[in-house]
UniProtKB/Swiss-Prot annotation:
Family: Belongs to the MMACHC family.
An example Gene Ontology CC term for this record: cytoplasm
Encoding gene (name): MMACHC
Cofactor(s) annotated in UniProt: FAD; FMN
The protein's assembly and partners: Monomer in the absence of bound substrate. Homodimer; dimerization is triggered by binding to FMN or adenosylcobalamin. Heterodimer with MMADHC.
Database matches in PANTHER family: CYANOCOBALAMIN REDUCTASE _ ALKYLCOBALAMIN DEALKYLASE, METHYLMALONIC ACIDURIA AND HOMOCYSTINURIA TYPE C PROTEIN
Protein name (database record): Cyanocobalamin reductase / alkylcobalamin dealkylase
Main location: cytoplasm
Length: 238
């Protein structure tokens, strides 16, 4: 069942520059405190959805051109929401729950921890402080970061697709590729991500197959309110 679902998802989202990776809810819940658990049985089939560098041209630009007569407040979020929600149409006989990376609970917690989901699904390795044996940071708070074996840091985790009626007790877990395997490189990665994230150098911690285009880099480095003009939009398209 998982293979049939995955095949349909790849067919629908792959040409738009998205990747999907399967996991069981239980794998995710097992590594988190109960407050962060997804409220589904352990064997429930889920997929984490990533956007790759090509999503900008394959999905975002066509979406903006098609929707430019409607109100657009956040082009990327609305594009991702449109395409992930459209997945329900290819599974008319299945219940599909969609959780987006920007959604939060009333408690202000995120609805899911994106990097944990990517790690347990084998999509991208989540490097954290505990992965560095000789910790040089003392009392400083250090955030972890996912690195994709093909795109390095040039990707984003966009959401989850959950299939509450599909149980996959025999799904085998794939470990993420440990592509930043040395102590020195892991330290450098966390240093760059935590203290120099704006220059984007952490994204190239490994040799990547594809990165954001110059146009895309400019778009994401521009303050959100000013991004509209880069896509030929006014602040709110009416």
């Amino acid at each position: 069942m998982e293979e049939r679902v995955a095949e349909r998802l790849h067919g629908a989202l792959g040409p738009l520059g998205f990747e999907v990776h399967a996991f069981k809810v239980g794998w995710y819940n097992a590594v988190l405190q109960p407050a962060f658990h997804l409220p589904y049985p352990d064997d429930t089939l889920a997929f984490v959805v990533l956007s790759t560098p090509s999503m900008f041209d394959k999905a975002l630009k066509p979406f903006v051109n098609k929707e430019r007569l409607k109100i657009i407040r956040d082009p990327v979020d609305q594009c991702v929401s449109h395409h992930l929600s459209s997945v329900k149409e290819i599974f008319p006989d299945q219940k599909v729950d969609v959780i987006f990376d920007y959604e939060i609970l009333p408690s202000r917690r995120p609805k899911f921890l994106a990097q944990t989901a990517a790690h347990v699904a084998g999509a991208a390795y989540y490097y954290q402080r505990k992965d560095v044996k000789l910790d040089p940071w003392g009392e400083k708070k250090i955030f972890g970061v996912c690195i994709h074996p093909k795109y390095g840091g040039w990707f984003a985790i966009r959401g989850l697709l959950l299939f509450p009626d599909v149980q996959v007790p025999f799904l085998e877990q794939s470990a993420p590729v440990d592509c930043v395997s040395t102590e020195e490189k892991r330290t450098e990665l966390l240093e760059l991500f935590n203290f120099h994230w704006q220059d984007g150098r952490y994204r190239d911690i490994i040799e990547v197959k594809e990165r954001y285009s110059e146009e895309q880099k400019t778009y994401f480095s521009t303050p959100p309110a000013e991004r509209f003009r880069l896509l030929g939009l006014t602040r709110f398209t009416e």
